[in-house]
Amino acid sequence: MAAKKVVKATPKRSELYTVDAQGKATTSHRACPRCGAGVFMGEHKDRFSCGKCGYTEFKQ
């Protein structure tokens, strides 16, 4: 019998935005400069990285 595949849980798109008191939505994550708006970078301890294209920015 084949082993079952593990399904990775991705964050909901609504969790990546914050809404202020006036009702304006802003992003809580950094957008990838290569991929453009809508593709967010993951925040790690020492870097920001894009999961789509692999672009990485190191924290100072």
Swiss-Prot record:
The keyword Nucleotide-binding does not apply. It comes from Methanocorpusculum labreanum (strain ATCC 43576 / DSM 4855 / Z). SUPFAM superfamilies: Zn-binding ribosomal proteins. This is Small ribosomal subunit protein eS31. Belongs to the eukaryotic ribosomal protein eS31 family. The gene is rps27ae. GO terms for cellular component: ribonucleoprotein complex; ribosome. Zn(2+) binds at residues 32, 35, 50, 53. The keyword Zinc-finger applies.
